[in-house]
Amino acid sequence: SPAFIIAEIGNNHQGSVAFAKDLVDLAVESGADAVKFQLRDMDALYRQRGAATAGEDLGVQYTLDLLSRFSLSVDQMYEVFDHVKQHNMDIMCTPWDAPSVQALVDYGIQGMKIASADLTNHELLRDVASRGLPMLVSTGMSREEEIRESVALLRNAGASYALLQCQSAYPAPFKDVNLAYMDRLAEIGQCLVGYSGHERGYHVPIAAVARGAKIIEKHFTTDKTLEGNDHTVSLLPEEFKAMVQQIREVEAAIGSAAPREVSTGELMNRVNLAKSLVATRHIAKGEVVTEADVAVKSPGRGLQPNHLPQLVGRTMQRDVEEGSFFFEGDLKDDLGTRRDFKFDRPWGLPVRYHDYKPLIEEAKPDFLEFHFSY
């Protein structure tokens, strides 16, 4: 199945419902399968508000300032969700606290994501798991024992979940991304795995899909210079669209581990470039073929060279002219019964210029289709 691609709008709407709706529209045009937002109840989430933040680290103060200005209220978020529904697009949201979980459940959200920062927040994990909704769980800034603890909690709760490999640095250095860890995550979680990216560009998510990621999440913006933590690691609409297209191309290219078949394109090149077994002299019906009677020459319209041992020593069931191809029928004891096809309407065949003359002498079609080139 194709990877599920999420446009993470988060708080990149800058606290504007209108801007959030515009981002949704652009995400739809860019080919995203879902959009995702974040919902916080600031009173429930942070231990200090307002002037009390003076005692906090400057990074925390900056984050609180951004969130106070750029967060949407529950009612505003519902309005944006309604807009998403008009596009028949999936909606996901990250709740950062218990009141936000309840607000999302009250709306009828389709799925929730646990942020990397909350992987060890077992109370929140239990709350979301108890709601019976699909869960995505990011594993950034976590130790493996913490991941295992949270996975055990989710499994005991009977949750439906997937794990996302994530490097929670903005931007994430490529050397720290570690896509190979997805294999270990799949083993730990016994679940689908994906990738939530904070690196610049979009080639890493494409590589993640090639490595087996079934979920991709990338931040989405219209301007990487806007104020906020996520804009610099976000993709512009045209970048996101290119990522989606290239992911789909890679998925098509991955194919399967089924026994190899010759593709339609290869069949033509097999004829043009491969070699065949060809008669070096006129061989009459009833004669035995010797190795001296056979040469290997292009093109590959006849019996492949690896059939030479099977051909040598056989008695020919037909006349073969010098320079003519041997065919698979020459390896059989009889040529089979020729069938006389009749059609109750005009019929034709797609042909190449170099082989249409003998064909029309034998088959007598009503029309031929030629492919033209320069």
Predicted regions, residues:
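Catalytic cores and adjacent flexible loops of soluble metabolic enzymes
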Residues: S1-Y374
